Amino acid sequence: MKQLINNDWWPVLKPQFETANYQQLHNFLVDEYGHQQVYPEMHHIFEAFNWTPFSKVKVVILGQDPYHGPGQAHGCSFSVLPGVAVPPSLQNIYKELQADLGCPPVKHGYLRSWAEQGVLLLNSVLTVRAGQAYSHQGHGWEQLTDAAIVALSKRPTPVVFILWGRAARDKKRLIDLKRNFVVESAHPSPLSAYRGFFGSRPFSKTNQFLEMTGQAPINWQLPSTVDHL
């Protein structure tokens, strides 16, 4: 499975694959993928890392675990593949993006153009059993993704960490706040979006920090159509 990381994330994460924790996780996943329906497909597990190399990361949007419906998850937080209905949380993200920067919502949920500009779409847990949210929590993914957050936090070039919801905000403890910038609010889920997500302006705040630190801002406007995977 570790062979699925094919860029400069590998030397960053390699020590995690040499731990007893990872061996336990590996054994758990072999059993789960062998006997259960698990998302995403195995070759997509590390998609977030492959889409956004370590040296290119400017922003991290931290999710909790993958979508657990058929065909939704493909290894990147909040994103879904072309042709899949836009999930409610992502619909709310689009609403806030329009209110914040005037970007009209698109009809797909494929966030690759963000990733290619340096937005790491990272979930804390990288797999899930079909129909069972949070079912793979506590089996070892958190140690690996925490290590990724810590490594980014220590990089010379500062990073923006976007933390939506209690689980993501708990990761603030891993981040060097003197060097980096945290944008945090309620989760965009319909259950909580009106409790502080709407009106939080995460996209403009992110770009202001990037420009202040000499980095190019993110073009948050997604293409209206998607013609590549």
Curated annotation (Swiss-Prot):
Chief location bin: cytoplasm
EC number in record: 3.2.2.27
GO MF annotation: an example: uracil DNA N-glycosylase activity
Enzymatic reactions: Hydrolyzes single-stranded DNA or mismatched double-stranded DNA and polynucleotides, releasing free uracil
Enzyme class, broadest EC rank: hydrolase
Keyword Transit peptide attributed: no
Superkingdom: Bacteria
Gene3D superfamilies in alphabetical order: Uracil-DNA glycosylase-like domain
Places the protein is found: Cytoplasm
SMART domains, sorted: UDG (SM00986), UreE_C (SM00987)
Entry annotation: catalytic residues: 65
UniProt similarity note: Belongs to the uracil-DNA glycosylase (UDG) superfamily. UNG family.
Protein name in the entry: Uracil-DNA glycosylase
Organism: Limosilactobacillus fermentum (strain NBRC 3956 / LMG 18251) (Lactobacillus fermentum)
